[in-house]
Structures are given as structure tokens and as C-alpha cells.
């Protein structure tokens, strides 16, 4: 999938059909109800479950109050513009609780851990691990064989469309709770220490830390050993 630019994302959101899907558990004299074709029904006898848009389901419930003994509604979004990514055929390990929106690219053998939030237009390279509760903003790009530590935020940019996204090159290790501001590029093989706030580009093969992040040293054998990417964790 080719990465979307900001104008394409804006157009996608603008022109998408906004959705408020609901799931409703029903019981009552349901055989007397005529369900619209846009409502999916899974009903046996006097109980069942239906799926549909709230704009269709709400008047249906109101019109059939006499035939419905009770119901419970589940709803998790309102006028949502971007569906979640269909993950069934992605060649990666994606753990429960990750929230990944449509139009995201995920490379082979990538790992997305619990609680990660990945916005539209983001790109994750082959073999990269996105740890727990990481936020990848719109159009954020992470290269191959990286590790983005738990709780880190890679700022997204959809508006203004002229802004540049965060770019993380290959073989980068970012510690926990790091914030990378929009437009920053982190060079290949760099290491960003936990808790850093990265406000400017990071040179390849360097180690940075602090608020704001500053270069501490060139990557040496000791640091490389401590930040080694383990391919065993990426096997499917």
C-alpha cells in the first residue's frame, strides 16, 4: 500500500460515509417485526442480536416497542469517518487491544502490542515492534527492524497538510515514554533513551537522551548489545 499524503487523508475523511454502528440484543415477539435489509439479524425464537446503523435501528426500536420486551444497545463510536483496519490477512503479530485504523501499512513479521494506537496513513516496516500503549500519529513512518518502546508517542500530522511527519529509519531503538515531535527524522541505527523528548533530527548511529534530546555519544558495542533487536520475537 502506498503511503497517503496529507491531502489524500483529508479527502478520505471528508468523503467517507460517517458511521454510527450499533449492536442490539433483543427479546420479545420478534417474529412480528419486519427488519430492514440494511439491518443484519441473528434471531432464534424470541431472542436475538441485530447489527446496523443507529439512524436505521433507532426508529425500528421505537416503531416496534409493543413487540420488544427488552433490549440492550452496544455502541462504541459516533459519526466515525475511518474504519478500523481489516487485520485478518496481515502477515504480522497483532495482539488484542491494539487500535489500528484503516489505510495503515504493516510490514511482514512486525509486532503490534496491546494498547498501541496507530492512526491513518502510518507505516510500520518489516520486523518492527510497536510496544504497549505506543501512539503512532497520522503518517508517522517507522522503518524496518525497529523497536518503539512502551508508551512512546510519534507525533502525527494531518493538518496542516504542509507539515512533515515523523520518520524513523531502519534499525532504530526508542526507549519507553519517548515523545518525538512532528517533522523529526531519526537516522538509521540510532538509539533514543527512555523519557526523551526529541525536537530535532537525530543523526544515524548516535545515542540521544534528555529533554530536549541531545547527542550523548556514537553508538558503541556496549550500547548495541543492550539494545539488540531479537528476531525470535518476530517469528510467526
From Swiss-Prot:
PROSITE patterns in the record: HEXAPEP_TRANSFERASES
Pathway per the UniProt entry: Amino-acid biosynthesis; L-lysine biosynthesis via DAP pathway; LL-2,6-diaminopimelate from (S)-tetrahydrodipicolinate (acetylase route): step 1/3
Please list the coiled coil stretches: none
The GO terms describing molecular function are: tetrahydrodipicolinate N-acetyltransferase activity
Keyword annotations = Acyltransferase, Amino-acid biosynthesis, Diaminopimelate biosynthesis, Lysine biosynthesis, Repeat, Transferase
Q: Which Pfam families match?
A: DapH_N, Hexapep, Hexapep_2
Q: Which reaction does it catalyse?
A: (S)-2,3,4,5-tetrahydrodipicolinate + acetyl-CoA + H2O = L-2-acetamido-6-oxoheptanedioate + CoA
Q: Which Gene3D superfamilies match?
A: Hexapeptide repeat proteins (2.160.10.10), Malonyl-CoA ACP transacylase, ACP-binding (3.30.70.250)
The record, for InterPro entries, names:
DapH, DapH_N, Hexapep, Hexapep_transf_CS, Trans_hexapeptide_repeat, Trimer_LpxA-like_sf
Gene Ontology biological process terms in this record: diaminopimelate biosynthetic process; lysine biosynthetic process via diaminopimelate
SUPFAM superfamilies in the record, alphabetically? Trimeric LpxA-like enzymes (SSF51161)
The record's annotation in NCBIfam families points to:
DapD_Ac (TIGR03532)
Which protein family is named in the record?
Belongs to the transferase hexapeptide repeat family. DapH subfamily.
Q: What is this protein called?
A: 2,3,4,5-tetrahydropyridine-2,6-dicarboxylate N-acetyltransferase
Q: Which organism is it from?
A: Listeria ivanovii
Protein encoded by which gene: dapH
